[in-house]
Amino acid sequence: LHPTQALSCSVLYYKDLSTGKIYAVNAEDYYLDVDAYIQIEPKSKRKFARLWYGWDDFAQGGINEHGLFFDAAITPEQQKIKGYGNPRNNLGDKILALASTVEEALEILEKEKIALNKSHMLFGDRTGQAVIVEWFGGERKLRWIDDNKLVMKNFLLSKPEAGNHPDFRYNSIIHRINELESSGQEINLNKIGNTFGLAVQPARADKNKRLGGTIYTSFIDITDNKFVLSYRLSNDDLVILDLKEEFARSKRQTMNFETVSYTHLTLPTKRIV
């Protein structure tokens, strides 16, 4: 397993034009020995309730009570922008705590003088607005959603020639979405999740015998506040949450993937992904 493969991630923000429903999917690929978990923070006077997933007290992605979703993915390293830098704290948690829309998230990035030089970020909200934020060439680049979908992989959309492109996983997701839309079938969270069938990575060892692959895949119905997470590509043991209920709780929750009580669910189709 090549290091860049182990670090590969796939993110989708999708709006069903027939129903207006909004979905988000993320496949987090990394080394499988990390202590990954879900963190749910309760609402307070100045902070929104929010759920994020990641490890080492750092949010890799998540969503808050207002339906603001974010995720990040590694990209080829770029020159740092003068006066800006990478975050020194849990940036994702801070954004989910304080922002309710894509525009507000962008304002926080600017206020905090954040310019990631080794990754980019996708933000999407409940209104149907979404953007991928990238930094290179001394400035911030915004790739706004221009139809009903936004896909993020590990290459810079504003500068694909920088590396990690072309990407067959990116092409596969786009192709499967096009097939789904042209089929005339009703679109739901399960079918949107199926577009990641070739984007996930089964466990494989690298030259140092360290296992890498898809740690978890999250499926979010932003409109209806539904959250499903598959750990290590399991289609039987799932974390299934009603976000409205979880965000109404008054205490912090931490769900470690190795110890959490999973739900066994018979799905309408055989696989989520």
What is each residue range found by the language model?
Residues 145-207, 211-214:
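Flexible, glycine-rich surface segments
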